[in-house]
Amino acid sequence: MDSQVVEKAKELLRRYPQFSFPLDIEELVTEVGCELIEWKFLSPVKEVKHGRWIGIAEGLERNEQRYLAAHALGHHLLHCGNQLWFRDWHETNVLKQEREADEFAAHLLVPESELEKLGKPTTWEIAEYFGIPEEIAASRLGQFATEQERERWDLLDEI
């Protein structure tokens, strides 16, 4: 878990307190100054971030579209200015940015304050409640969980 990435998601939610959950990611993308468009991308492309435009492939399930929009917004806010690719730029830098965008999306769509209200929900309950893919819900409960969340869940297990 990257605390700077989590903080960036929290900061964005504090800046726009009018949003409730499940988060209207399309409206938030617009508020931030980006434009979300559906596009007929060729497989396997599902999402493209270019400047202020976020393109999402047509025909995807709603929960996947929501996640991809949040993921692309993460790239926009976390990696702005890092769009140049160098010949010797190591693949781990790309993987790091992708992981950060995933973590940002997970915490933006499923913030700690909202997750706490559910007690210790299952992956399916999180996916259903927040309108996200189950894989992202599983990551949010696993690799992207904060230390405070893990401690709280451990206490709930003891009860």
Regions flagged by a language model, labelled:
Residues M1-I159:
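Active-site hotspot residues in diverse enzymes, especially metal/ion-binding acidic/histidine motifs
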